[in-house]
């Protein structure tokens, strides 16, 4: 069975997400695996697939800042901090924001914060807009293996039946930079 999802098949992808499935899709540098951030079942599947502990927390990727607002608390950001974030978005920089108590622990892990990104990858923008909200996004690779950069690499690691949105990555060599939205501290070099 071929579960490649052509770029124009957003209805099929949305259906998979609504059914709490995990999908793979291209991002700025590597393929990501993602799911509905509001579904504990879907996130649990993603964590099991990645062999990733829930306490590490996850990243949300979105088409717009508006899609991220239900999951983060940006009220304490100064004008300068806000400008620093928005100068990088949309783009391949992930920021860690304070998270309100309503943000599920399956997203934040052991933290009171959440890593989020407004992407400029056109396919992911279209996917998040079609779904109407952000996606959980973590690199598409099994524990101990390098992140996938092609559909073929996703198939090799996750199997032929794993649903993959066809498309090219954005060509960046490194995964997204991660910074603290409040302090600007660099957590991961991009």
From Swiss-Prot:
Q: Which Gene3D superfamilies match?
A: DHBP synthase
Name where it mostly resides: cytoplasm
List the EC numbers from the record. Answer: 2.7.7.87
Query: Keywords, A to Z?
Result: ATP-binding, Cytoplasm, Nucleotide-binding, Nucleotidyltransferase, Transferase, tRNA processing
Subcellular location(s): the record lists: Cytoplasm
Entries under PROSITE patterns matching the protein: YRDC
> Could you give a single Gene Ontology term from the biological process aspect?
tRNA threonylcarbamoyladenosine modification
InterPro entries hit by this protein: DHBP_synth_RibB-like_a/b_dom, Sua5-like_dom, TC-AMP_synthase, TC-AMP_synthase_SUA5
Where is the YrdC-like domain positioned along the sequence? Answer: 7-190
Is Repeat tagged as a keyword? Answer: no
Q: Work out whether the entry's keyword set contains Lyase.
A: no
Q: Which reaction does it catalyse?
A: L-threonine + hydrogencarbonate + ATP = L-threonylcarbamoyladenylate + diphosphate + H2O
Among the entry's GO cellular component annotations, what is one? cytoplasm
One of the record's GO molecular function terms = tRNA binding
HAMAP family, alphabetically?
A: TsaC (MF_01852)
What does the similarity note say? Belongs to the SUA5 family. TsaC subfamily.
Please describe what this protein does: Required for the formation of a threonylcarbamoyl group on adenosine at position 37 (t(6)A37) in tRNAs that read codons beginning with adenine. Catalyzes the conversion of L-threonine, HCO(3)(-)/CO(2) and ATP to give threonylcarbamoyl-AMP (TC-AMP) as the acyladenylate intermediate, with the release of diphosphate.
What PANTHER family would the database entry show? SUA5 (PTHR17490), THREONYLCARBAMOYL-AMP SYNTHASE (PTHR17490:SF18)
What protein am I looking at? Threonylcarbamoyl-AMP synthase
Q: Which organism is it from?
A: Salmonella typhi
Query: What gene does this protein come from?
Result: tsaC
């Amino acid at each position: 069975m071929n579960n490649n999802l052509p770029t124009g098949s957003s209805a099929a992808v949305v259906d998979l997400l609504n059914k709490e499935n995990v999908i793979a899709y291209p991002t700025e540098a590597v393929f990501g695996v993602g799911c509905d951030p509001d579904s504990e079942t879907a996130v649990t599947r993603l964590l099991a697939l990645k062999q990733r502990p829930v306490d590490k927390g996850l990243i949300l990727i979105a088409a717009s800042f508006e899609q991220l607002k239900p999951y983060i608390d940006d009220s304490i950001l100064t004008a300068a901090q806000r400008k620093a974030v928005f100068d990088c978005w949309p783009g391949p920089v992930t920021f860690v924001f304070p998270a309100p108590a309503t943000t599920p622990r399956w997203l934040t892990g052991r933290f009171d914060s959440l890593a989020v990104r407004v992407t400029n990858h056109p396919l992911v923008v279209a996917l998040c807009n079609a779904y109407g909200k952000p996606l959980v996004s973590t690199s598409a690779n099994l524990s101990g293996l390098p992140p996938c950069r092609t559909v073929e690499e996703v198939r090799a690691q996750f199997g032929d039946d794993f649903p993959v949105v066809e498309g090219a990555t954005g060509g960046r060599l490194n995964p997204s930079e991660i910074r603290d939205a409040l302090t600007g501290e660099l957590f991961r070099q991009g």
